From Swiss-Prot:
Pfam families: YidD. PANTHER family: MEMBRANE PROTEIN INSERTION EFFICIENCY FACTOR-RELATED (PTHR33383:SF1). Keywords: Cell inner membrane, Cell membrane, Membrane. Could be involved in insertion of integral membrane proteins into the membrane. This is Putative membrane protein insertion efficiency factor. The lineage of its organism: Bacteria, Pseudomonadati, Pseudomonadota, Betaproteobacteria, Burkholderiales. InterPro entries: Membr_insert_effic_factor_YidD (IPR002696).
Amino acid sequence: MKTVLIALLRFYKVAVSPMLGDRCRFYPSCSDYAREAIQYHGAARGTYLAVRRVCRCHPFSAGGIDLVPPPNSDIRARGEADARSHRL
C-alpha cells in the first residue's frame, strides 16, 4: 500500500503540480510531507498526518517549517502551534 500511495504522490508531483504552481505555504511542500510521512510512519498513520497537514495549508495559514514528526512520537504535541513558531 505504501508503494501505491508514494506512486500516486509522485504522479501528482510530476503531472499535476506543475500546472498548479507553487501554492504550499509550508516547507517541505505538502506532497513532499505526505511522501515522507508515508515512508516513515506507514500507509495509515502517514496518510493521517498528510491529511492533517493539507487541512492546515490554506490561504489564511501563516505557513512555515513543518517537518514530519519522528516515528513513535506523540503527534498531538505538534500541530499548528509548532508550525506557527517556525515561520520561514
